Amino acid sequence: KSTLASLIPRLYDVTDGSITLDGRDLRSLRQNDLRAQIGVVTQDPHLFHDTVGANLRYARPGATDAQLDDACRSARILDVVRALPDGFDTLVGERGYRMSGGEKQRLAIARLVLKDPAIVILDEATSHLDTENEAAVLDALAFVLSGRTSIVIAHRLSTVIDADEIVVLENGRIVERGRHALLRDAGGLYADLWEGLVRDDARSVDHADLAD
């Protein structure tokens, strides 16, 4: 699945077959032009040892303070940034203020908003987050992904149930594709994964009741 995330921005090209965008083979497009239209959020986004503002402006060097505010508001991270010791001037990264996994993800989403790409790739963007942080990130993504071509690579079904089309891969091959309800009722691999998720959720509720 992550190989696909590398093929779309042409980090390397397919050796057999083709990948098309609006009917055009990606190999016919200039790499710089293609990548300028793509934004990526991975499971562990990188923050440079720099200020929050500088990390955001890597996506748009000329961004104004108001644009930083708007991007962070869209990514549901503005209140967190304002609460930092020096706001947008707070040093983060390797030797700076350590942000939580959910905060880093939402900062990466804010960077995505500033870039304003036509195509968004999310590569396991919520896989390392707890339930509370995942909910905050998904809330941010629901707003940001609206109206864009979005490719979401995920193991967590909660991330993709609202997708226009879900593609199920097994051993590098497509075994199912369709919308959530269709795949859930088809009795295939996706249905098995969904049933497992439902069982896990039921156990969590039972454990919570016992704890109470």
Which positions does each model-derived feature cover?
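Conserved catalytic loops of ABC-family nucleotide-binding domains
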Residues: F143-V152, V160
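Hydrophobic anchor residue at the start of the ABC signature
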Residues: I109, I153
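Helix-to-loop junction immediately C-terminal to a conserved catalytic motif
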Residues: P9
